[in-house]
Regions:
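Conserved C-terminal beta-signal and adjacent last beta-strands/turns
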Residues: 8, 21, 182, 241-248, ...
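Short acidic/polar hinge/loop motifs at secondary-structure boundaries
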Residues: 100-129
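Short, acidic, small-residue-rich periplasmic hinge/interaction motif at the N-terminus
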Residues: 21-53, 89
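Surface-exposed extracellular loop regions of Gram-negative outer-membrane beta-barrel proteins
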Residues: 340, 443-457, 461, 465, ...
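Transmembrane beta-barrel wall of Gram-negative outer-membrane proteins
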Residues: 170-196, 209-275, 308-329, 386-391, ...
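Outer-membrane beta-barrel translocator/receptor signature
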Residues: 119-122, 132-208, 242-246, 257
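Gram-negative outer-membrane beta-barrel transporters
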Residues: 432, 561-565, 574-576, 580-583, ...
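Flexible loop and strand-edge segments within Gram-negative outer membrane beta-barrel domains
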Residues: 241, 245, 259-332, 338-376, ...
Length: 742
């Protein structure tokens, strides 16, 4: 399938009021449970928060997609799950202020990362397994979103920021207001942002459905199939690409000589559509096996099917630091977080008459909603035992997390995870080299169950009993294991302008609850996904080397890495089994073609013939790749012009020689940035190459180019405030070709 993203023209008016001006610029440092400076020598990006506030409102993945080694798994405008060096899912962790963000994005590729990007200080991206200093099992890396909701420093001045954003491509708008100040010795922080984006507009003929045929005898359906495609192409927009979110946060902190303590509350509610969802795949096969013309008439009567998700999350956090100043322990940093998250996925028929919109969810009661819930409690402490010769820290952390899925698509029984971590970090100047070392032990216990479905009686004569005894035995599992991981890095300056860093890491990851206990239909992906409670832990061994050169005007960076993963876990489609199953059901449909439509739907639901069967399986794999970047800055007029070129490549193969599925293609990124006093102009061209190294059952992804540009102007002299205006266009001239999940 292909889609064309129309140009996005956005105007952001950002007005901030400072009672007095600030001349000091705060130093940007890395934050985590282990380290609070940029001492560790590994591939790292620190992105200033203004890059997000001055740009378009997008998903987290879209916002960081232009950085080398980082790409996204796109599932509509709301969902863009980050990929780091080809690794995704549980191998990449999203953190908020150094603590893992525990939503349900790991329970489905169509679930968004529940992170509020309003008024953030910075985003830190650590690539590779050396990010184990932040969280367990991070073979791919981490993305840490940092804000000052619980401020570690006193707000010296009150500050009010308001902003408005408009996007033409989706007739959308966004508004925000942020308040900061010191009230009675307490730092108070409040933020609110409301976003409402409609469906993405596209030119007529831009959306093309190219479903794969699974039978050789289906040629007679082609004309009908093309008629369906034509109706989709003339829509003028991408159906179910809308997105609305309302985010509120409030924090209070107290800073004294002995340290600080504070609390914060985050609440986020959203509604978003899921374009090109898996039910389209299923419905097409349903047409092929059943009443095609009846379905067409129903389609004309009820219109397009809408699949959408609503989310509601609330997080309560306590964070603080106590200066012990003892002979062994200098200070103790502590955190507590209670997360309550729910995502409801529902289906409805979109009516052709606007006055009937409120009846959408009543039209098809058979599409009962599915509710994904996650409740987690996490607390930890970091003990600073540094001395004059080295930086040393010890961390302990505990997590208790419950996942549950209730409803029609409950493809996993409730599961519980308990994790206890103890870790150690050391940074020391050895004279010739700078040494960084991290080690952690994680004791993890996962409890869950798998319901075995009985299909033997489904196709018998006694159809009335199918719903009465749908599931067979329930097998309960308790997996208790201890994983160990470590990373070591050596850095050295070869000259005043050239530095080198060598890193080695071994990271062990216990399979996630989904990989262990999944067993059911996942309609949004069009698959019947099956986990395996007997999966072994993944173990990755990574080596990377990075060269940095910077003489002021010219800079260059080259990073090369290789990662061997023992027992790599991947979701593998069973194409042959799916075809056999379809043929089996086709024969049964012919045998029972006189039976009513209700029985036919019942048959498909229990046989899962419309879904691709996919299993979580293990095999050794090797990932390798590189990232190179070089640039030059010039004085131009009264400003500065900076030009840069970057390229990232990742290759991934299993031990038997076939390619790991869903690996992002190579990219070339060209950048132009011009700055002059209060003016900033950015132009970025992303050239993505064709991906031919595909997994079994996948199709090649075409190359494409994406051009993004932004102009930001800051107006000062407005009393005690300033006005910032940004005008930008994303992909104004280029076609974007994406292979969407089937």
């Amino acid at each position: 399938m292909k889609k064309f993203l129309n140009a996005v023209i956005v105007l952001i008016a950002f007005y901030s009021i400072n009672i007095i001006s600030q001349d000091e610029v705060e130093e940007i440092v890395v934050t985590s449970a282990f380290i609070d400076t940029s001492e560790i020598n590994n591939p790292l990006y620190i992105i200033d928060g203004t890059e997000f506030s001055d740009g378009a409102t997008t998903s987290l993945g879209d916002a960081i997609d232009e950085y080398l080694g980082v790409s996204i798994a796109d599932y509509g405008s709301a969902v863009g799950q980050p990929i780091i060096r080809g690794m995704s899912g549980p191998r990449v962790k999203i953190l908020k202020n150094g603590v893992v963000n525990r939503d349900v994005s790991g329970l489905g590729v169509d679930h968004l990362n529940d992170v509020d990007l309003n008024d953030i200080s910075q985003v830190e991206i650590v690539k590779g397994p050396s990010s184990l200093l932040y969280a367990n099992g991070t073979i791919g890396g981490i993305i840490n979103v940092v804000d000052d909701l619980i401020s570690t420093k006193n707000f010296e001045i009150p500050e009010v920021s308001v902003g408005y954003e408009s996007q033409s491509v989706n007739d959308g708008n966004s508004e925000f207001v942020n308040l900061k100040g010191n009230v009675g010795g307490f730092n108070v922080n409040f933020g609110y942002k409301n976003t409402d984006f409609g469906n993405y507009d596209v030119p007529s003929g831009a959306v093309i459905h190219s479903e794969e045929e699974h039978h050789d005898d289906e040629d007679h359906d082609e004309d009908e199939h093309h008629d369906d495609e034509h109706s989709e192409e003339d829509l003028g927009y991408i159906n179910n690409s809308d997105f609305a979110v309302e985010a509120t946060k409030f924090g209070v902190s107290k800073v004294t000589d002995w340290g600080y303590i504070g609390f914060g509350i985050d609440n986020l509610e959203s509604v978003y559509g899921i374009p090109f969802h898996g039910d389209e795949h299923g419905d097409e096969h349903g047409d092929e096996h059943g009443d095609e013309h009846g379905d067409e008439e129903e389609h004309e009567e009820h219109g397009e099917e809408r699949i959408f998700s609503t989310t509601d999350s609330e997080t309560f956090s306590i964070r603080g630091s106590y200066n012990v100043n003892g002979s062994l322990v200098n200070k103790v940093d502590f955190t507590y977080r209670d997360s309550d998250y729910s995502l409801t996925e529902a289906h409805a028929e979109e009516e052709h008459h606007e006055e009937e919109d409120h009846e959408e969810e009543e039209e098809h009661e058979e599409h009962a909603p599915t509710v994904f819930m996650n409740e987690a409690v996490e607390y930890g402490a970091t003990f600073d035992i540094s001395n004059d010769s080295s930086t040393q820290k010890v961390v302990v952390n505990f997590v208790d997390e419950d996942n549950s899925i209730v409803g029609e698509e409950a493809f996993m029984n409730p599961a519980n995870s308990e994790e206890f971590t103890i870790g150690y970090y050391l940074s020391k100047d050895l004279g010739t080299f700078d040494l960084d070392f991290g080690f952690r032990l994680d004791q993890i216990e996962r409890s869950g169950s798998v319901s075995e479905e009985e299909h033997g009686d489904d196709h018998g004569d006694d159809h009335g009993d199918e719903h009465g005894d749908e599931h067979g035995d329930v097998d309960y599992y308790n997996i208790d294991d201890t994983t160990s991981s470590f990373a070591i890095a050596l850095g050295r300056d070869l000259s005043d302008n050239l530095g080198i860093s060598l890193g080695y890491a071994s990271v062990e990851r216990l399979p996630s609850s989904i990989e262990l206990f999944m067993n059911g239909p996942h309609m949004a992906t069009g698959r019947f996904e099956v986990g395996d409670p007997n999966l072994n832990s993944e173990t990755s061994n990574n080596f990377d080397i990075t060269f940095n050169f910077d003489n002021g005007d010219f800079y260059a960076l080259a990073s090369f890495y290789i990662t061997d993963v023992d027992n790599y876990i991947a979701l593998i489609d069973e194409e042959d089994d799916h075809m056999d199953e379809d043929e089996h059901h086709e024969g049964e449909d012919e045998h029972h073609e006189g039976e009513d439509e209700h029985h036919e739907d019942e048959h498909d639901d229990h046989g899962h013939g419309n879904l691709i069967h996919a299993n979580y399986m293990q095999e050794d794999a090797e990932f390798d790749g590189y990232e190179i970047e070089f640039g030059r800055s010039f004085d131009l007029g009264s400003g500065e012009l900076a030009l840069s070129f970057g390229r990232d490549v990742v290759n991934a193969e299993f031990a038997d020689g076939h390619y790991v599925p869903r690996i992002n293609p190579a990219r070339n990124i060209y950048s132009l940035v011009y700055t002059q006093d209060d003016l900033l102009f950015k132009l970025m061209l992303k050239d993505v190459e064709k991906q031919n190294d595909i997994g079994e059952g996948e199709t090649a992804t075409d190359s494409y180019q994406m051009l993004n540009t932004r102009l930001t102007k800051t107006f000062n002299g407005l009393g005690k405030g300033e006005l910032k205006v940004s005008l930008f266009a994303n992909n104004p001239v280029s076609y974007t070709h994406l292979t969407l999940p089937t």
